[in-house]
């Protein structure tokens, strides 16, 4: 982690992956992140076998950029038990997920998904935030 006047910078590979149920997080900007902010939350999420299956969840409005997808897809819908829509994910796709829309990222056998997540706030960004 380096600083040049006010700008801070780091390579994502230098940030420890936080292994959570269903995904690994690389917390770049926000609460409990490499760069502290209460105004925004940005980082990477890794979906692969070692983290288990991602459960459907809902949270603050989010923008997602797909940085890697091997047999990956996203499902979304009206509640956790009714994810009626599914699309295959491709590198470079941008998803805008409205506030409180239920969704989950998945992959077929041998696959994985990596995303950049962007929130314009510091609260209600991860399922774990809602459990506290």
Predicted regions and their residues:
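A generic "binding-loop/recognition-motif" signal
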Residues: 59-60, 70, 101-102, 111
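A short beta-strand-loop-beta hairpin characteristic of the jelly-roll/cupin
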Residues: 63-91
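Short histidine-centered beta-strand/loop micro-motifs
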Residues: 31-32, 52-58, 76, 85-87, ...
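Double-stranded beta-helix
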Residues: 8-11, 18-22, 38, 78-83, ...
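Short, small-residue-biased leader/transition segments that mark boundaries at the very start
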Residues: 1-3
């Amino acid at each position: 982690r380096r600083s040049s006047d006010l700008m801070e910078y780091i390579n994502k590979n230098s940030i420890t992956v936080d292994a959570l149920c269903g995904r690994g997080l690389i917390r770049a900007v926000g609460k409990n992140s490499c760069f502290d902010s209460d105004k925004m939350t940005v980082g990477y999420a890794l979906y692969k076998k070692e983290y288990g299956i991602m459960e459907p969840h809902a949270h603050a409005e989010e923008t997602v950029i797909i940085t890697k997808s091997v047999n990956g897809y996203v499902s979304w819908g009206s509640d956790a038990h009714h994810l009626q829509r599914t699309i295959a994910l491709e590198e470079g796709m941008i998803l805008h997920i409205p506030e409180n829309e239920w969704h989950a990222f998945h992959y077929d056998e041998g696959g994985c998904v990596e995303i950049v997540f962007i929130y314009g706030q510091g609260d209600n960004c991860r399922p774990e935030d809602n459990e506290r």
